[in-house]
């Protein structure tokens, strides 16, 4: 999922 990866990047 891209959303999970994006959330990881933000955090």
Swiss-Prot record:
Q: In which pathway does it act?
A: Carbohydrate degradation; glycolysis; pyruvate from D-glyceraldehyde 3-phosphate: step 4/5
Principal localization reads cytoplasm
**Catalytic activity, per the record?**
(2R)-2-phosphoglycerate = phosphoenolpyruvate + H2O
Is this entry keyworded Lyase? yes
Which keywords label this protein? Answer: Allergen, Cytoplasm, Glycolysis, Lyase, Magnesium, Metal-binding
Q: What is its EC number?
A: 4.2.1.11
Subcellular location, record wording: Cytoplasm
- Record's cofactor remark: Mg(2+) is required for catalysis and for stabilizing the dimer.
BP GO annotations: glycolytic process
Keyword field contains Acyltransferase: no
A GO molecular-function descriptor: metal ion binding
Give an example GO cellular component term for this record. cytoplasm
Cofactors named for this entry? Mg(2+)
- The kind of enzyme this is, by top-level EC class, is lyase
Q: How does it assemble?
A: Dimer.
The protein's job, in short, is: Glycolytic enzyme that catalyzes the conversion of 2-phosphoglycerate to phosphoenolpyruvate.
Query: What family does this chain come from, according to its entry?
Result: Belongs to the enolase family.
Task: State the name under which the record lists this protein.
Answer: Beta-enolase
Q: Which organism is it from?
A: Gadus morhua
| Gene encoding the protein | ENO3
């Amino acid at each position: 999922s891209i959303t999970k990866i994006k959330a990881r990047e933000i955090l």
